[in-house]
């Protein structure tokens, strides 16, 4: 869950395998918000498998994702109003700012004259419907491409480990326990991009956690050949995110794998 999720997994392709999915990634989404997004989904849906893209594990304690108002807004404003959202606000938002997330009109009162039907309809959807309605069920369908010139393949198999922020491990533990309680299978995935030293080394550390908890981690950084990724055409921005072409390759592989191993 993060922009890596909404750039990598296309629910329409999963539909072709009779797998009904929803992509709940948000920009720079940190693991604390991710936990509450998963909790919210499990509260209202009967979910068999939770696929967690692990890039959110690599944010450090002082990264902007933990303190940015923009990240808070994109993570919380699209959550339906519920006990889980209230818990998320109390846990993730500084106390002096919480009122504006409990009552959004407090935050936006100065622009009340600009409110129109779309504003109220959006509030209705987020507050009263189980899921906020989005085109492509949360996936971002970007077709632009920028050539990726770095040789990622040569370093993807490094076995070096790097410490992961303990707060992220805490929420990964909570996600694991929540899925166990709800009877949902947790599967970890690392998208093929980005793929550089720090990400590879921290993915190895998360892989150790997964092995200790008997959880599968599919590391697509090491499956670039299987996916037949083309770094001239499959990256949106020169090596950080996939575009529609690259996401199609990942989605087809993951959907086929899930279908064969968990839904036959």
Description of each model-found segment:
Residues 28-32, 162-168, 194-202:
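Acidic-and-aromatic substrate-binding clefts and catalytic sites of carbohydrate-active enzymes
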Residues 21-28, 160-164, 239:
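Acidic/histidine-rich helix-loop elements
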């Amino acid at each position: 869950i993060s922009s890596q999720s909404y750039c990598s997994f296309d629910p329409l392709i999963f539909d072709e395998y009779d797998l009904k999915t929803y992509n709940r990634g948000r920009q720079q989404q940190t693991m604390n918000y991710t936990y509450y997004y998963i909790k919210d989904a499990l509260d209202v849906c009967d979910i068999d498998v939770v696929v967690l893209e692990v890039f959110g594990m690599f944010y450090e304690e002082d990264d902007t994702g933990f303190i940015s108002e923009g990240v808070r807004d994109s993570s919380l404003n699209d959550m339906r109003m519920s006990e889980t959202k209230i818990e998320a606000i109390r846990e993730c938002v500084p106390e002096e700012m919480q009122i504006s997330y409990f009552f959004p009109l407090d935050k936006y009162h100065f622009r009340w004259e600009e409110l129109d039907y779309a504003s109220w309809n959006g509030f209705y959807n987020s507050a009263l419907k189980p899921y906020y309605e989005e085109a492509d069920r949360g996936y971002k369908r970007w077709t632009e491409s920028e050539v990726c010139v770095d040789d990622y393949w040569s370093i993807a198999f490094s076995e070096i480990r790097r410490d992961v922020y303990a707060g992220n491990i805490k929420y990964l533990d909570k996600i694991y326990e929540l899925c166990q309680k709800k009877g949902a299978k947790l599967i970890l995935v690392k998208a093929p991009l980005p793929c550089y030293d720090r990400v590879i080394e921290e993915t190895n550390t998360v892989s150790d956690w997964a092995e200790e908890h008997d959880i599968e981690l599919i590391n697509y950084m090491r499956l670039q050949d299987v996916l037949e990724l083309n770094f001239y055409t499959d990256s949106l921005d020169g090596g950080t995110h996939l575009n529609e072409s690259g996401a199609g390759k990942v989605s087809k592989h993951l959907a086929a794998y899930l279908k064969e191993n968990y839904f036959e």
